[in-house]
Amino acid sequence: MKASSDSASSGPRVWRNWAGTAKATPARWCRPPSEAEISAAVKDAASAGLRVRALGSGHSFTAAAATSGVALDLSQWTGITAADTRTGLVTVRSGTTLRALNAELGGLGLAMANLGDIDAQTLAGALSTGTHGTGARLGGLATQVEALELVLADGSVVSCSATSRPELFAAARIGLGALGVITTVTLRCVPSFMLLADERPMPVEEVLEQFDALAAANDHFEFYWFPYGRKALVKRNNRLSPSGSAGAAGAARALPGWRRFWEFEVMENAGFGALCRLGRASPRLIPTLNRFSSAALSARTYTDASYRVFVTPRRVRFAESEYAVPRESLGHVITELRRAVPRLADPVMFPVEVRVAAADDIWLSTAYGRESAYVAIHQYAGLPYRGYFDLFESVVAEVAGRPHWGKLHSLDVERLRPLYPRYDEFRRVRAEADPEARFGNSYLTRVLGQPVTERLRNARSPNRVRSAARSPG
């Protein structure tokens, strides 16, 4: 089967990511509505000598999705295909956005155990780049995956799980799109739950002193810090019992619609966006505006469905870099940023975000084998960020920081290899699954290199990734 004329088009259409930090001009665009057409598009690309990248929603800051070959737009490949409310196992098509998934799960009385703070990403894109939320006892989104189906470079479809092709599963849960096109994901979900959200400012020094205690005492803990300010906004989100009567929840209610609109849309987006535009027009004002934003932080407490607390609207555009560091190294990183940021030539408008995660066993996970703190730095769109991001990388390099795969960083193969104990095993599995780098691009070449095809030729079991592959349809 060839990709149908209804789902394929040619022409100089430009792809851009949300932040405006990456763009590309694919030779072909394809919107396959079925697994069979995804497979056909991959085969057609191979016949034409073109590379293939599956597009998400463009919320990676890197050029992870960029291609000059075939762009696979999976926006017609969406929805839940199977759900067992007893076990919580839910199978989802890969082009489904987290926003749509959360709504569908809610209708089934289910939820994701943990989420990041935006929901615009596709499920496959969020998994492939290592998207995470926060919680000292919880892992990133990929730790909620029970099984995957992928279309490999030859167009065959394979399934993998912890018991079936476990190496492919260990690699593909956070695979950067380098192993194949994820078509379905089976998630282990939990019963729907409510969160009690408590947000309040605290002096930065107190937050750092109490960091471990705060992380241990709360289901989901994070804080934001404006680099020139003295206060951080500490966010504690805790799960409620089904009755919703735990602790302070008796006095908390969901935010009324008008207040939610005022605080999230008007104040945190329109108002902050206006301050950012003022800072961009007159950079010398940025430290003052930053301190004003820090001083204006206020407290609020409310309850809502988990995904409505985890996720907040993001209308103000920015560039971002994020690194995972050992939990015990967080204080050093923040202290160095507090010391160095005021001396930067280009002032910083946006806050720093800090989150936590449990260790996991996913090969390219930034939390592989260690409890982690995530430090994310941002700069408003249109303001210079290179000096700030370079400074940040020099600080986190001192503590073996690992970069988020979907956020801006400068690391390459030689600098990444020592950070990931299973890095070379991932590259071996990639060489088996995609020996010609059909799913490659310039970003993957930088962070993974070219597949080592000689290993594939010399391997004792060269077909173990592809064995028992099935035809799509």
Identify what each model region corresponds to:
Residues 1-473:
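Noncatalytic alpha-helical scaffold of FAD-dependent oxidoreductases
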